[in-house]
Amino acid sequence: MTPGRTGLVAVALLGLWFAPAHAETIYVTIENLVFTPTEVTAKVGDTIVWDNKDFVTHTATATNNDWNVVISPKQASKLELRKAGTFDYFCRFHPNMKARLVVTQ
């Protein structure tokens, strides 16, 4: 292999080594006034999709007010995770609906 090609192969392999991980989409179902699953672990950059199967509007609202997602009846809403931490959340309209989102780097 010539020196030019060796360098090109090394750069290509280095790019594969440092390529960012593929972001995941994680689904949470809302049905009968319950978030399922009640605890989700995800990574920064992942997307959470709340799929509301109920006939009423819900929210997914972080208890620390970092985010608030409104989910219309029979619709889905999403949130891209931008910050690591443990986030307890609830529905503003139905405060007994509670869940936890653990976001890692």
Where in this protein do the model-derived segments appear?
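Extracytoplasmic copper-binding redox domains, predominantly the cupredoxin/blue-copper superfamily
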Residues: 2-4, 13, 18-105
